[in-house]
Structures are given as structure tokens and as C-alpha cells.
Amino acid sequence: MKPQFSITSNGSDITSQIADRLLSLTVRDEAGTKSDTCSVVLSDKGQNLQLPNDGTELEVKLGYETLVSLGKYKTDEVRFAFPPATITIRAKAMPDTFKTQKTRSWDDKIIADIVSEIAAEHNLNHRIASEFATIEIEHMDQTEESDAHFLTRLAKEHGAISKPAGGTLLFIPTGEGKTASGKALSVIEINVDEATAYSCTQKQRGKYEKIIAKYNDKETGTEKTVEHMLNSTSEDSAVKRIKTIFPTEAEALEAAKAEGIELQAGQIDVNVTIVGRPDIFAESPVKLIGFRSDPMDTNWTIRSVTHQFNSGGYTTKIACDNSD
């Protein structure tokens, strides 16, 4: 089957206008808080192409007989180059307004209300996983801090990720392969025969064995700590201390647990390149079949997916973390 693509610009299909000029189309889907991105490289022969305005919405689809949407992106950069004469259009899923610094306080709010309010400010829909929706935030300051950074900080404290994707602000579990509704993502199976290239890198296990977080005890008016152990019970364990002082013991412990999950993640990295598959998305669980059993016979979560379409065909490159 021959791979195909389509691109719409502010809702208008421009595929036929650029098909004979397309040199490459790249979509990078990121797990976690990084913004998903899109890059379109076109031949600028004749220099008569109409260029997109800053903030133009592009929707990209890839596939074969049936095309799959890989998201919507706002253009934020156009680059000209010679030789050869080319135009590179870059776009991202995160709105520029997300970078604007703000100062405000969030008091006696549940996370669902915070996410909903920020999403509305940026004309986004929102989806939040049920396990986070009703968590109460007694007090949290946003001081000269962008909404992107603030939500990242809030999400990290609760073992979640928060990012705009496809016009929706997400607040979902980190690396658990679930949608915002709590539904498990389908396990992606990749056979070694599908791979055109792959690599596996083992990294030294993190040095920290204990996480300490601080909080204000209202009853005594003093600063106290909570501890979360990772792999050791030794008194000589290396300690990671979280700088933030939390308003409650529960929030401090939640943040310590989330920090522990992050420190233990990604101790083995796997990268696999296969023939293009538009059904593969970041955060999905992966099962590798027929690869070297040690250390690749384990559970994986996709950290990033790069879809690339050009004259040579359509490939999908995935980068995975071990999720055990």
C-alpha cells in the first residue's frame, strides 16, 4: 500500500496545492509535558507559494487507504533557505499564550476547577483523569509563572502530566498508558520483523533511595518533613530533598511519591524504527516481540513518536522507557 498524507490550513484542505512540492512532513508526538510539534518542508521553486500566517492552524493526517489524524498545530516559524530553495514551516500544539507569565494564587480549589479555568483562558477543551479531578489544593501560588510551567509543576506533584494536545488541555497519569477518561490505551505490538532499525541502552540506576518533602504544620506552626523510600531501607541511603514547602502533609507525601516515580523511570531506553504506523501514540504501552529477550523482554511505555513522510516513504520512530 502506498502511504498518503493530507494537510488542512484553518480548515481548508491544501493537500493538492502542496503535494508536488512536499519534501518532508514530520510529526513528533511527545509524552509528558513537552509540546507536540509538526514540521513541513516544501520546495520553494518559483517562489510563488502563499505562506501561512503566524498562528495558522494545521491539521495533519497520515496513513494508507484510511488516513489518521495526528493532531492540530499552530504555526510559529517559517524559514527560507537556499540552495536548494526550500520553505520550512514549523508548528506546535501548545498555544503561545501558555508562555505568558502571570501572578495569582489558587486557594481552596480542586484540580478539576484549576484545569478547567486555565483551559478556558486559552480557548481549549479540557480532559482530566478522575483520580486527579477532586484533589483539593488548599493554597498554591503562581508568581511570575506561565500557565505551562504552573500546570507542569502541579501535575508533577501528583504524578501526572499536563499538556495541550489537539485543542484539548490534558491532565492525565504519567506513563500509565491511560486516557483522561481512565480507559487503558491499547497495547502496541511490534514484531522484530517490522523493525528496520533498533537500539537498546541500559543506564545506571538512579543514586537516590529516599525522597524527603517539607510541609507547614498548621497546628504547631512549624515546618515538618515526610519521607518516601524507594529501593532501600538503609539509613545511609542517598536522599533527594524537594525544595518546595507544601501546605499539607498529604500534598508533601504525594509530591515525594511522584518524584520517586520520575527518578526510577527510564533506566533502559529502547528506540525502534518501523514502516509508518499512524496508530502509534506517545504514552501507549508497547510489547516487543522477537527482540533480544534480555533486557528487552519487559513492559515499555512510549516516550515519543516521530512520524516522517517523504519521497522515500513513511516511517515511524518510537522511543520507549521501561515501565516496570
Predicted regions: what they are:
Residues 1-96, 195:
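Assembly/oligomerization scaffold segments
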Residues 39-40, 103-127, 142-165, 283:
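Amphipathic, non-transmembrane alpha-helical segments in extracytoplasmic/periplasmic proteins
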Residues 86-100, 312-324:
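Short solvent-exposed strand/turn elements
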Residues 46, 78, 84, 99-102, ...:
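Sec-dependent N-terminal signal peptides of Gram-negative outer-membrane/periplasmic proteins
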Residues 57-60, 66-68, 73, 98-108, ...:
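Ser/Thr/Pro/Gly-biased, low-complexity, turn-/loop-rich segments
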Residues 74-82, 176-178, 299-311:
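Short, compositionally biased
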Residues 86, 91-95, 130-196:
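Short beta-strand-centered interaction patches in the first periplasmic/extracellular domains
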Residues 21, 25-50, 194-324:
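An acidic/polar, Gly/Ser/Thr-rich interaction patch typically located in mid-to-C-terminal regions
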